[in-house]
Amino acid sequence: EIYAYGLRNPWRYSFDRQRGDLWIGDVGQGSIEEIDFRAKDTGAGANFGWNAYEGRSSFGGSLRGGPHVPPVAQYSHSAGCSVTGGYVYRGTRVPALRGRYVYADYCSGRLWTMRAGPSPGGVREDTGRLGVKLGNVTSFGEGSAGELYVIANGSLEHFVQAEEAVAG
């Protein structure tokens, strides 16, 4: 069974541990990086549109198969050049991140979040930039309690509340 197709270069994907939804960071070719989303109960066979689309823009290829599922978020290469997919934060140590999808850009080192709603229509592209730059973010990880980790420039970092980082 093919669960999803029409992806150019999916660079990290995850399932929301609470809802079971699929999140994919898909690296673009020329100018757009995208975040793709598939709700748990929507079934297999999603066509994310590559090579007919890059992000929400027509790319010139031919759309094969079913209808195109556009990304829930995208950004241009003026903000970075290679998305690194992350996780929906379900931990307890950083309350402001609860229920938000956290992802990054490899080239700029920027980390962003966006709200993960209770349904596909509830996903919001209200992307907020976290006030941190880590360098080349290559991957995220999720601990058994839902806490997030990020790998950048050969180091493993753990997400904690700002006061905890200063005090600890």
What are the functions of these language-model segments?
Residues 138-167:
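Blade-level signature of beta-propeller repeat domains, shared across WD40, Kelch, NHL, RCC1
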